[in-house]
Amino acid sequence: MQPPKTHNHIELAFEIDSDLYELYIAVLSQVGIEYFLEDDHKLLAYLPESDWNADKEASINIMLQETFGSVPRFTASFMADRNWNAEWEAHLQPVEISDRFLIIQHQKEYDVKPGQIVIAINPKMSFGTGYHATTRLMLRQMEELDLADKKIMDIGTGTGVLAIAARKLGNRNPILAFDNNAWAAENAVENVAENDVADIRVELLDAEEELAATLEEGYDLILANINKNVLDRILPTIRRHAPNAQVLLSGVLVYDEPWLKQLLKRIKYTNVKTIYEDEWLSALVEPKN
């Protein structure tokens, strides 16, 4: 799989209080922005140059206005192709997800506690470094599950961290991990190799266009750490085409929990367990038969 032909990006710089970073990331992710850096007094968001136009700017302004009641001033700057990996690595430190999980940069040495599961990530600009609360919530939920014999699908895999974690938690069946972003899919392939985990199939797929046919392969657990808008569209598809599968999801803000409960009720899922961190939640749900 090849990364996009151009790596030129637009950098959006928001001068906001750091307490608002998580909320802004949630809002901006709903208009298709996936890559962020947290700098001193600024949240930096990146999107491919080809995606930046008047309609995208208008969508951002509308989302910010609806969420915050006003549109904060932000700048948009062209960023030529650069070593994004170096940019990312300069900001990354090891992340202790729990007593059991540690996420580190690839090819770096860290002190590891006895019994700790280590996941080495070379993140490029893919989602899933452990720095975002939704990734941490998903991993903490996964720790509590018996994954050994489940056939697992990871939708929007990003760095591949959840699929890798499933294998390191003892899963013995084939795992399908996919993303609709070529750069992310390539990154996940690299991280699977870096962690020396076998039988994880990484694909470049569109969750909304190709999900139904892919689900026909038969899955027991669907991992979906993606944004609310995508969840709204794909959960009914999962319910129809994987009628017995559990779904572990995140990417939903706490204030959107009423929406999630209504959706789950409508498509006949029951909530097994929900956990929270900051403004985010993760829910494990299963079919109500």
Curated annotation (Swiss-Prot):
EC number(s) stated in the UniProt entry for this protein: 2.1.1.-
Gene Ontology terms describing biological process: methylation
One of the record's GO molecular function terms: protein-lysine N-methyltransferase activity
Enzyme class name: transferase
Catalytic activities: L-lysyl-[protein] + 3 S-adenosyl-L-methionine = N(6),N(6),N(6)-trimethyl-L-lysyl-[protein] + 3 S-adenosyl-L-homocysteine + 3 H(+)
SUPFAM superfamilies per UniProt: S-adenosyl-L-methionine-dependent methyltransferases
Binding site for S-adenosyl-L-methionine: 135, 156, 179, 225
Keywords: Cytoplasm, Methyltransferase, S-adenosyl-L-methionine, Transferase
Subcellular locations according to the entry: Cytoplasm
Chief place of localization: cytoplasm
Pfam families: PrmA
Any one GO cellular component localisation term in the record: cytoplasm
Disulphides: none
HAMAP family in alphabetical order: Methyltr_PrmA
Role this protein plays: Methylates ribosomal protein L11.
Family (UniProt): Belongs to the methyltransferase superfamily. PrmA family.
Protein name: Ribosomal protein L11 methyltransferase
Organism field: Chlorobaculum tepidum (strain ATCC 49652 / DSM 12025 / NBRC 103806 / TLS)
Lineage of origin: Bacteria, Pseudomonadati, Chlorobiota, Chlorobiia, Chlorobiales
Gene this protein is translated from: prmA
